[in-house]
Amino acid sequence: MNNIVVFGGTGEVGRIVVEKLLAQGRIVKTLTRNKTSKSSHTNLNLIVGNVLEVSTVEQCIESQDIVIIVLGFNNSSLDTMSRGTANIVSVMLAKKCNRLVCLSAQGVGESWEHMPDSFKTMVLNDPILTASFKDHTLQEQVVKNSNLNWTIVRPTEIVDEIESGGYCVNGYKDNLTFQISKYDVAQFIVDEISNSAYVNKVAMITN
């Protein structure tokens, strides 16, 4: 049975990822900054700390087989995702933990040129979104240069819709929207931990 650590496991998508892993009987660690948090499941180990602290990251990754990163953007620290991911990758290499699944966003990197003009305008006119995409771009560079068995997941706009039970990977069809349920994003991430189809690849997903 794989031991899995989820960074960002208390966020919108992260919580669902953790729930799905626990439902499979997995042993899960997750990091929280809330000192009063308590585990609600016998297979869930909560570590209190910050992803920017290397010692905390070392504690999280100790004896783990798979790392999942679903970090969110932090307005108070504009490079939390990239710096935190750099810490995670460094510790993974030191501890010989090789499998990494990292959540990014559609529009990051080379996918920017394929985005609708309306999307580009929205991002460029919003300083927070602009900073978030910059941080995601740096984060992806860290992952791609890591020599790990990585998968980068780029969802379209994540929405609170119910789980559809399916998703489209690396392509659009006429009947697809530029949105995806957060539950479907979480399911794809969970599916990826036992799937080699997207190792060292970027997977764009949408409904």
Feature annotation, model-predicted:
Residues 80, 153, 180-190, 201:
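Substrate-positioning beta->alpha
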Residues 110, 146, 162-167, 192-201:
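Glycine/proline-rich active-site loop of Rossmann-fold NAD(P)-dependent oxidoreductases
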Residues 45-65:
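Conserved Rossmann-fold cofactor-binding substructure of NAD(P)-dependent oxidoreductases
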Residues 74-100, 138:
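NAD(P)-cofactor binding segment of oxidoreductase domains
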Residues 4-24:
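N-terminal Rossmann NAD(P)H-binding glycine-rich loop of SDR-like oxidoreductase domains
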Residues 140-161:
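Conserved beta-loop-beta element that borders a ligand/cofactor-binding pocket
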Residues 31-36, 50-51:
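N-terminal Rossmann-fold cofactor-binding loop
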Residues 65-68, 101:
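N-terminal Rossmann-like NAD(P) cofactor-binding module of classical short-chain dehydrogenase/reductase
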